[in-house]
Design a protein with these regions (language model features):
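Bacterial N-terminal signal peptides that target proteins for export
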Residues: 1-11
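C-terminal outer-membrane/trafficking sorting elements
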Residues: 468-491
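Boundary at the C-terminal end of the N-terminal hydrophobic targeting segment
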Residues: 22-27
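Lectin-like carbohydrate-binding module/patch detector with strong preference for beta-trefoil
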Residues: 310-462, 475-478, 491
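An active-site-proximal structural segment forming one wall of the substrate-binding cleft
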Residues: 66-72, 93-119, 125-152
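Extracellular glycoside hydrolase catalytic/binding regions
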Residues: 135, 149-151, 155-305
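Bacterial N-terminal signal peptides
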Residues: 11-20
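Active-site-adjacent substrate/metal-binding segments within catalytic domains
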Residues: 28-112
Length: 491
């Protein structure tokens, strides 16, 4: 039995950002695979964050690096945002300095391996009519050609907004979509609709207008986050066989938004319902002229900072003897053992779905050590388990098995196997207290581990909100855990 050394508790929790995300899975080329998005050819549930004011500041590198390390797949930006320098003129031409600024944003996003939703708008440009808007969007798409990591929203909530403050007509959307495809045939194109359009009508509009994705803004009622509500919307959106993108859910201070748990549950339910992507919508990215997005997020603990800082799941894995934890010796870079009696930084692992979003049973996952290394099945299985990998590839990919089909929750008993045929299972010798290897042929007691959600909120010096006294939702959130590896239903 080995007790944790006191010095280990002095280790700064590098888990909070650095190296916490599976790097190769979140790369540069965004495509469509059936009714899902794909990144570098691999289908992936995408998590975006609204950053409308990104054009307001000269250097976005710090913010985009932070968002990537926090676990986001992409950002949603508005080049014609009301507080920033506009991209377009009323005659349909583009402003050169704004083009340069947009390129800097997109170059930084590409460098940090972030996907970008470029959402255009016309109502912010006085005198811009629909024909000139077509000209402007087409010119902008020409400027976007070097970037494979983005999609284009022709107009935000086109059923409400458009040139001269009126909606952008369906025929205009169809014409602009055709012009975009003529300029860049591989560009992913959508045109978002508000809740004024039903999900069923939005799905049909996508087909009629020749769009690739159904981007939808949900109703901002009190039940917006619940499984039944999200499943109803996503099911209707997916009837056209194309990706359903929940592009703009509700935000604070609308009903049921004052705690991050609502957003964690909504994201989980979006993935479970089969959505292709979900966006964390916040007005804190609307105006960043005098600060950074990160500082604005940190200034509001609930819901923004709590959600953002806990997006990457952090867990301990307890062996089936109930007394030992998996440990990346030295915090990573060497051996993995199962001989520690108390969980600390070295026993705290990032638990990231390579398939995107919260971890569900059957997902392919990576396990990250506190120094940024990843767990590796040496030779792909049949031998040692180490924490020596600097990136995630085949040897660093494991599949989660448990006794249900839903999201992985605090207290779940899981097994982890290689994504090979035949598979190899991570095995704690003698069910704990000794070595760990990837040598199991089936999931038995030695291959079974209990998921314990790490107390990330306290580690980040964040106050944990008092969720008592709010009935069923209170119980659901406690079952969901603090990090979004959530409970069964949350209806």
């Amino acid at each position: 039995m080995t007790c944790p050394h006191p010095r280990r508790w002095l280790v700064v929790l590098m888990l909070v950002t650095a190296g916490a995300v599976c790097r190769p899975a979140e790369a540069q080329r965004l495509t469509i695979a059936g009714d899902r998005f794909a990144v570098d050819g691999g289908p992936r549930f995408l998590t975006f964050i609204s950053y409308f004011g990104v054009m307001e500041i000269d250097d976005v590198d710090e913010d985009l690096a932070f968002l990537k390390n926090a676990g986001f797949d992409g950002v949603r930006i508005w080049p014609n945002w009301r507080d920033g320098p506009p991209l377009m003129r009323s005659d349909g031409t583009l402003i050169a300095t704004a083009i340069e600024r947009l390129h800097r944003v997109l170059d930084s996003a590409r460098a940090h391996r972030l996907v970008v939703d470029v959402t255009f708008t016309a109502e912010e440009i006085p005198g811009l009519d629909a024909p000139q808007y077509l000209r402007a969007v087409t010119a902008a798409v020409e400027e976007l050609k070097p970037y494979d990591n983005l999609l284009v929203d022709i107009h935000n909530e086109r059923d409400v907004h458009g040139p001269f403050g009126r909606r952008l007509a369906a025929d205009d959307v169809t014409s602009i979509a055709a012009a975009v495809k003529a300029a860049d045939p591989n560009r992913i194109v959508t045109a978002s609709n508000s809740p004024n359009t039903s999900p069923e009508s939005a799905a049909q509009f996508t087909v009629d207008a020749g769009l690739d994705v159904t981007a939808y803004h949900e109703d901002r009622g009190a039940n917006w986050y619940k499984a039944e509500q999200i499943e109803r919307v996503v099911t209707a959106l997916k009837r056209n066989g194309r990706p359903a993108y929940l592009q703009e859910p509700t935000r604070f201070p609308f009903p049921s938004t004052d705690r991050s748990d609502y957003f964690r549950i909504a994201r989980m339910n979006a993935k479970r319902a089969g959505a292709a992507a979900w966006c964390f919508h916040t007005e804190l990215g609307f105006d960043v002229r005098d600060t950074t997005f990160k500082r604005r997020l940190a200034a509001r603990v609930q819901p923004e900072w709590s959600f953002v800082s806990e997006l990457v799941a952090r867990i301990h894995l307890r062996t089936s003897d109930g007394m030992h934890y998996l440990v990346a010796e030295g915090g990573g870079g060497g051996a993995v053992l199962a001989d520690r009696r108390f969980p600390g930084p070295w026993e705290t692992l990032t638990f990231t779905s390579i398939d995107g979003g919260p971890v569900f049973a059957g997902d392919r996952v990576s396990l990250g050590a506190s120094d940024g290394h990843f767990f590796r099945a040496e030779a792909g299985g049949g031998g040692a388990l180490t924490a020596t990998a600097e990136a995630v590839g085949a040897w660093e990919t494991f599949v989660v098995e448990t006794n249900h089909a839903g999201p992985i929750a605090d207290g779940d008993q899981i097994a982890l196997r290689t994504d090979t045929d035949p598979p190899w299972y991570i095995t704690a010798d003698q069910s704990g207290g000794a070595s760990v290897a990837v040598v199991g042929h089936a999931a038995g007691p030695w291959e079974t581990f209990e998921v314990i959600v790490a107390a990330a909120a306290s580690e980040l010096r964040l106050p944990i909100p008092d969720l008592t006294g709010i009935g069923r939702f209170d119980a659901d959130c406690r079952r969901a855990g603090r990090l979004g590896i959530a409970g069964d239903d949350q209806k």
